[in-house]
Each structure stands twice: as structure tokens, then as C-alpha cells.
């Protein structure tokens, strides 16, 4: 009898961080190894990856890591996974080249080279499953769905996808192949849910291209385009419009340079004239109406860069009168307030702003109708909605019921849930560790909720430092309390509070020194408690308080 388990270490009840495990007997297949970028309250965190403990404990079972596409939410955790687990990595040509950029940039994995290029005709036979692939449509070329064939039926993972009948070559979904997979029999479908709550018509990429061309054609001065660097379909549209209107394209940002150069080398991006791309230092050689500045980076980075441009702090570009800023990325809900602030700054600097979402519904993910079409093609026995917040997964589940999938065969997972197939279907049998692992610089997992809470306090209420010198032996204060603050109050207007705080500390320490017993921790705790109470009464704020008590022997 074949034993089958399904586990989501990421990508459920959240956006990004796609990481799914399919276990068949003693074999483990990893579907995507993605990261996500931090939320607003995760201060100082660079990125977030899944908890890999379970995979590391079972690394001898791993048959391979199979990548659906080249975005960070599918490949970004690879360096951290490969530092612990040695396994072959499979993906399309572009996906593998972009994965190499991530892997080679990490000192722990820069020598790793067990990469394998596959395409929609590839079949790889393992002891416990046959892995194959099918073409999908997304905002990056050569995205693919993944099929694991078992004697119980196919297990299908879509990755990020949508249907676009007007998609250009390299972005087309293979509908015939999907129908064939459905005829073979699909045991379980793990399907993209990001856009499941919407039935709005998604603009085709040809419509998006026409809209972009119109915007650039109407612009009299420089056009500054803000895009996600790995959204290659959007970057190709920028190149096409630039060529059509006699403009040169300036790439700013290391990510944009690396990704675009890689895609050009592989001919996944096409330009008709190598002179189209110019260096930032050469901008002064051209008139404003001859330039498009492409500010492309990771998710959220283009908006941060626009803020610097508008404030005059960007390395290469300062927004000026006549500039048009064209935002062709869809900001996350968490970034909407920031986008509004940046728009204000741009207008103050003399520029103007257009968002691609003003006139078009743009997405790289299937809407409700597309999801139902996919389910009708594949006819899965079981559905696991993945890739989305809970509301998206629940909407996907409802869509599945409408096309005839039994409610008891639809499973909305929590991260770490172990789903085991038996005679009654997939049943929940416990879980594995699946908490977020936060990366801060080179520190992996050292940033927890306590650290984030402290950072939040520091960012909102600042820090209050008080230093005092005592003689434990003589039971007296040698040097009275001195106070310093950062981010708490404006010192020039708060002399009274600081003076009274110092006097309070002198009193607290003086009273403590009269006691027969002496404990450094207790003394600092008393100072912290008394100060905290006083400062809250005076300011209604609770800064982080750092008492420094020094001893003279």
C-alpha cells in the first residue's frame, strides 16, 4: 500500500513563502522553496522563511526540490534550505538561472551546483513517483505546474498561474496537457488561491501593453517606471514601448540589473537594439523626452526608491518638474498608505503619478472563473487551496463546491498540518513545526516576538537611559544620575521632565542603599519601575528604560 502525506510549511493563510511537501512512502518531494517579505510590524526583519526543522530531520528522504517559477515566493528560501539539505533542484531554464542568483549570493551555498533544467516534456522517474511538468501563464516566462504521478492518481501543484488567451510565447498555458492530466486521474490538487475572491475580468497582457504604450506615448518628459524586477512580462512591455517611442531605458537597482541581464542572455527578454539600455551615468547625454527610468527591485523596494527620488536622496535620480511616475506594480494592502505618502512627495517635487491599476484590473493570478475552469479540466478528487490568506482559501473552497467537489474532500490547511491519505480520504494527523523564521542580516531565527516587541517600543516610544555611580561599601551615591534619551522627548523642551527623572533616580537609589542587603538586579528593577511609572504619568508613553548602575570600589 502506498503511504501519502501532504504538508504545507508555508504558503497557506499568508501571501508568499510557498513551501509544500509531498511524502510518498519513504520519499519526500519539495514543491517550491519560497520566502516572503516582512510585514509592517516586523521591524528590522529583512525576510521571512519557513521553519525547516522537519525537512532537516528527514533530509535523507528528499528526492528533489521542484520549482514552479522564478519569483522569490517560490525560490527565495533555497539558500537556507540547501545549506542544510543536499538535494537536486529542478526547474525551467530561466527559473534555474534566477535560483542560482539567490544561491550563489549566500556564502553557505555559493558552491552548490546540483541544478537540473526541465521543460514541459520532461518526465523524471523516482522510486515512489513520476514527476512531470506543464506550462502555465504568469508574470514571468517559463512558469510551470508540477505533477507527481502515484498509483493512487496524480498530485498536481499549479504554482502561480492564470489563464490568458492572448499571452505571448513563453507565457502560454498548455490547456491540452491539463485535460490529459485530468483524464489520467487527479488524486489531489494544490492550487493558487491569491485571486479566488474576485470574478473581475483580469486584463490580458496585450491590453496592459497597450495601456502602457499609451501612457508613455502621452508623456512629454521623463517617465519613471516602478516595477518588480522579476515581473519580466512588465519589463518586456517597458522595452517595447521605449523602442516604439524612441526612448532609452535606464536600469537602477542591482536586482534589476542582475535579473534583466540574465533574462536577456537567455533570450527571455528581447530587445532589438543593444543601445536601448544605458547606464545611469549616461542620462545627461539625452533629453528628458528620450528617457525611461526603470526602477525595479524586490517587492516593496520600488516604492521605497520613489520616496528617495522625491526627497532628493536617491543615488541617481531626483524627481523634477515634468516627470511622470508610472507605478506598474500592484502594492500590497500593507503598502497602500506608504504609496499615498509617496504620491504626495512626488507631486510636491513637481512630478505626476499614474498607477496601472487605475484603468485596468491587473493580476498574475487566476480569478474565480479561471479556478473553476482548472478544476473542471483536472477533475480532482481532493482540493487543497494554497497560496493565499484564509479568506482566499475559503473562497476557493466555495468555488470547488460549486463545480461538484464534495465539501469533505476540500481541506483548508494550517501551516504544519500533516494530512495522511487512508481508505477514508485525507485525514489530519498532527503537525510539524511551521513557525515563521525571520532573517535579520546574517542572523537566522534570532529575531523572535520579544525582539520585535522591543523594536516596536523603541520605534514608537524611544529609549531612556539613566546612569549613576554608587559605592556599595560606603552605601552612598558617588556621581548623581545623568539622563539621556533617543526618540522619546525633544530634549530642549523637556528639561523639567529630565531633571525630575534624575532626581527620582537619585532618591530611589539612595533609599535602596540604606538597606542591609544589596542586589544589582533588584536595584535596577526598582529604578526601572519607578521611572516607568513617573514617565507614563508625565507623557503617557512607555519608553524602553535602560538603567546603568556603576560601582566605585
Curated annotation (Swiss-Prot):
Compartment list: Cytoplasm
Induction: Expressed in cells (at protein level). Part of an operon including SpyM3_0658 and probably SpyM3_0659.
GO biological process: mRNA processing; rRNA processing
Binding sites annotated in the UniProt record for Zn(2+): 69, 71, 138, 160
Keyword Zinc: yes
Pfam families: Lactamase_B, RMMBL, RNase_J_b_CASP, RNase_J_C
Gene3D superfamilies noted in UniProt: 3.10.20.580, Metallo-hydrolase/oxidoreductase, Ribonuclease Z/Hydroxyacylglutathione hydrolase-like
EC number: 3.1.-.-
Cofactor note: Binds 1 Zn(2+) ion per subunit. It is not clear if Zn(2+) or Mg(2+) is physiologically important.
Cofactor: Zn(2+)
Family affiliation: Belongs to the metallo-beta-lactamase superfamily. RNA-metabolizing metallo-beta-lactamase-like family. Bacterial RNase J subfamily.
Function text: An RNase that has 5'-3' exonuclease and possibly endonuclease activity. Involved in maturation of rRNA and in some organisms also mRNA maturation and/or decay. Has an overlapping but not completely redundant role with RNase J1 in the decay of mRNA.
Subunit structure: Homodimer, may be a subunit of the RNA degradosome.
HAMAP family (alphabetical): RNase_J_bact
Protein name, UniProt field: Ribonuclease J 2
Organism: Streptococcus pyogenes serotype M3 (strain ATCC BAA-595 / MGAS315)
